């Protein structure tokens, strides 16, 4: 439930054409609260950090999580400086220009890392995308599985288009300091764009993880054969 709320809030906050300044701030506070709740609910994970072997996938997961936490802290810290509504009761703080740059960088990198985290962690979400999943499914379900695959590919393609349309790369590189809303796009379209980018990122990191796991299995078989 918390994870679903996180994903929904993150997409909504990023769809800046849909929200005005005040709703954006309050949704951002709710998003940070959901991140804290997610960390608390998964606090046992921290105990596993000192156990087990670190392979490529585990290192990648750790980097994504560490970056995501850093982005969440950066977003909230910069929001304290920039806020006019949610934290409007605070005295004016200096450094608005720097805080704005930090906020934009943390927002867009946080978005990427959040859905990279989804792709690296959630095997069940993509299980039916595998060829084996379709071949082992009952005959009546196979058309549904293939339809789901085509839908995923279509959404991912729209996500790739949206990356270009929204100038996502320049935001990630820190070349844009203000959120530029496309006022010609309807609110629903703006949400669809960010949601499709989320699907694209999750899918890419899911298959990256699958490739790394397959490579590691191949290396293990080779070492055993020797």
Residue ranges, per PLM feature:
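Membrane-embedded alpha-helical bundles that constitute the cytochrome b-like, heme-associated redox core
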Residues: 1-226
């Amino acid at each position: 439930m918390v994870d679903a709320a996180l994903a929904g809030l993150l997409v909504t906050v990023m769809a800046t054409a849909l929200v005005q300044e005040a709703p954006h701030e309050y949704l951002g506070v709710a998003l940070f609260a959901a991140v804290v709740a997610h960390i608390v609910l998964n606090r046992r994970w921290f105990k596993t950090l000192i156990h087990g072997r670190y392979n490529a996938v585990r290192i990648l997961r750790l980097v994504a999580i560490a970056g995501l936490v850093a982005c969440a802290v950066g977003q909230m810290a910069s929001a304290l400086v920039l806020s006019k509504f949610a934290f409007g009761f605070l005295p004016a703080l200096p450094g608005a220009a720097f805080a704005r740059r930090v906020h934009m960088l943390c927002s867009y990198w946080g978005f990427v890392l959040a859905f990279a985290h989804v792709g690296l962690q959630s095997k069940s979400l993509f299980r039916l995308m595998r060829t084996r999943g379709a071949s082992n499914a009952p005959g009546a379900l196979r058309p549904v599985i293939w339809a789901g695959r085509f839908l995923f590919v279509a959404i991912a393609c729209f996500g790739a288009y949206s990356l270009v349309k929204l100038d996502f790369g320049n935001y990630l590189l820190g070349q844009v300091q203000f959120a530029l809303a496309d006022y010609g796009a309807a609110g629903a379209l703006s949400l669809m764009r960010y949601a499709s980018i989320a699907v694209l990122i999750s899918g890419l990191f899911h298959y990256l993880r699958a490739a790394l796991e397959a490579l590691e299995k191949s290396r293990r078989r080779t070492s055993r054969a020797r």
